Regions:
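Short, acidic, small-residue-rich periplasmic hinge/interaction motif at the N-terminus
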Residues: 2-50, 73-82, 89-135, 143, ...
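Sec-exported N-terminal periplasmic low-complexity segments
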Residues: 10-30, 136, 184, 274, ...
């Protein structure tokens, strides 16, 4: 190199020469066919030069062509097959046969203690239902959505209309008493919840068993189905080890949704269902009325009125739900609001329910400490909940025994269910026969024997899990469950004397349930080669308090 009048000599860079030589290395065109163990071509297999992005996929005949250096290594992969690695060493034609890869997907379930375990390691039977199954056809009581989806679980709807309870039994009835409690224990995120079914005979309010029962619903119906991630049915004595005798009928474990790291999502869903009375008795239309227990003469020209069909209408349930999910690596948030508006198959039966849920999860100290806080608020109002069973207060008795060939609309339209009484200067019940416990106007019972149910519920829980090391951790959980029920019933003057005074009857009830639950657990999880040991020891405390107040004017004044 000439620099002015000087000649400068420099040593050649050997590394640069090597790089140039490598870059200038000759490429070859590699062709091949990829097949399975039966010789069938595999379409869409990935063929990639190892360590680079240079690659292609096989065509419909399993063939591929790829330009690559002579000493390259190819990796062939396809879903469901074991990857194949081939060092070319100058080869330009390949025949590749791929072996199927047997994948064993282990099912993970949540145990009664809220701990995730492999299903195969459990010593009791369990079944799991996803949240999507529960929200496909939304019911005011979400537990009804389990019907027919799990083996050995029987679910019976109560006949008390909107907001009524459901009777659930796992592996058969355990109580010989028809009124015995066969209900399972409901556990939300590892914490038991109140599920009192306030179904009681009107005898508690001065009547007798013939007046039927008042069903004020159950606790599980208060939850928002859209908040449920999954539901597991746990069977066997060991499934309920933590909760003692209260879980003797089995456990239904509910896992709720929570925020997820790196996800921001707003979800809105709306659902509308229509109910209709389809299982009605068949009525004869050949004989007229005679006495209360016999038919009259045959009348071929008797007009057939659809008095029973006219009494019922289409029930409509509308549910709207909005949820917001947001989260970062260390903290996640979940919020939801839902409202349910429903009208029963009897027009005066109506329901209004609101749910608010807020959940916050956090991981601290390099994920050694996990915190989880959850608050659920619910308000519910139900008007004119139908009576379950009996005949004094059951409108179906008067509806079904009304004379064939007569038009019941006379006792319905324009307040035809009541008639002004000159002697008492007030409207009283209007009916084709004497008013008695056995026979009352069904439209009087739906319009002049009214009721209102109101419920407010709060569920709040907090849990902390501290990971001491890779195989030992401790957990503490606490929960508060508060329910405030108010019930009011009015029986107007003119209602049968079997249940009401001649001037009517007024009933008001208040009940407050308060439960505090706490538990502490130490968990050991250690693996040695093919052996593993899982152990947990803990203790729980549960305190329940009930306050109730009843006011009743009675049937004797």
């Amino acid at each position: 190199v000439m620099e002015g009048k000087n000649i400068v000599l420099t040593k050649q860079n050997e590394k640069a020469s090597e790089i140039i030589t490598a870059v200038q290395q000759e490429n070859i065109s590699v062709k091949g066919v990829v097949t399975d163990t039966k010789g069938e071509p595999i379409i869409g297999a990935n063929v990639v030069e190892k360590g680079t992005t240079n690659g292609c996929i096989t065509n419909i005949d399993g063939e591929f062509t790829l330009n690559t250096p002579t000493n390259a290594t190819l990796v062939i992969s396809f879903i469901g097959c074991q990857p194949v690695t081939i060092a070319l060493n100058g080869q330009q034609t390949l025949n590749v046969q791929m072996q199927e890869e047997a994948l064993s997907l282990e099912t993970v379930v949540v145990t009664a203690m809220g701990i995730k375990k492999k299903a195969a390691s459990l010593t009791y039977s369990t079944q799991q239902v996803g949240g999507d199954e529960l929200t496909r056809a939304k019911d005011p009581n979400m537990i009804n959505a389990l019907a027919g989806k799990t083996a050995g679980v029987s679910i019976t709807r109560n006949s008390s209309g909107l907001g009524g309870s459901a009777k659930v039994s796992i592996r058969g009835i355990r109580s010989a008493n028809a009124d015995g409690n066969n209900q399972p224990l409901y556990v939300i995120d590892g914490v038991p919840m109140l599920n009192n079914t306030s179904e009681q005979a009107f005898s508690a309010m001065g009547g007798n068993n013939d007046t039927g029962n008042r069903d004020s619903g159950d606790g599980i119906s208060n939850l928002n189905p859209d908040d449920i991630e999954s539901m597991s049915i746990l069977k066997g004595a060991s499934a309920a080890a933590l909760y003692g005798s209260q879980a003797a009928n089995g456990v239904i474990l509910i896992t709720t949704k929570k925020g997820k790291a790196g996800m921001q999502r707003i979800t809105f869903s709306s659902n509308l269902t229509v109910d209709h009375a389809i299982s009605l008795p068949e009525f004869q239309n050949r004989y007229g009325a005679s006495g209360e227990t016999s038919w009259g003469a045959e009348n071929a020209s008797m007009k057939a009125y659809d008095n029973v069909g006219d009494y019922f209408s289409n029930g409509v349930t509308a549910t709207n739900s909005l949820s917001v999910t947001a989260g970062k690596e260390k903290m996640q948030t979940y919020f939801s609001y839902a409202n349910t508006t429903a009208k029963g198959i009897v027009d005066v039966n109506k329901l209004q329910k609101h749910n608010i849920t807020f959940r916050e999860t956090a991981s601290l100290f390099n994920d050694r400490l996990t915190l989880d806080a959850n608050v659920n608020l619910m308000t519910q109002k139900i008007k004119n909940r139908p009576t379950s069973g009996g005949y004094y207060m059951n409108p179906l008795v008067g509806l079904y025994t009304f004379p064939r060939g007569e038009d019941l609309s006379v006792y319905r339209d324009n307040n035809g269910f009541e008639k002004y009484d000159e002697n008492r200067s007030m409207p009283l019940q209007n009916w084709y026969t004497d008013i008695s416990g056995f026979s009352q106007n069904p439209y009087w019972l739906t319009n002049r024997v009214t009721s209102n149910d109101k419920r407010f519920r709060t569920l709040a829980s907090l849990s902390a899990n501290l990971k001491i090391n890779d195989w030992f951790s401790v957990q503490a959980r606490g929960n508060v469950d508060y329910i405030n029920d108010n019930y009011e019933q009015k029986m107007y003057a003119g209602t049968t004397a079997d249940v009401a005074h001649q001037n009517g009857r007024y009933i008001k009830m208040n009940r407050q349930d308060f439960m505090v639950y706490g538990d502490f657990m130490a968990m050991f999880n250690k693996t040695w080669n093919d052996w593993s040991l899982n152990a947990a020891i803990g203790s729980s405390i549960n305190t329940t308090k009930v306050n109730s107040l009843s006011l009743d004017s009675g049937k004797s004044g």
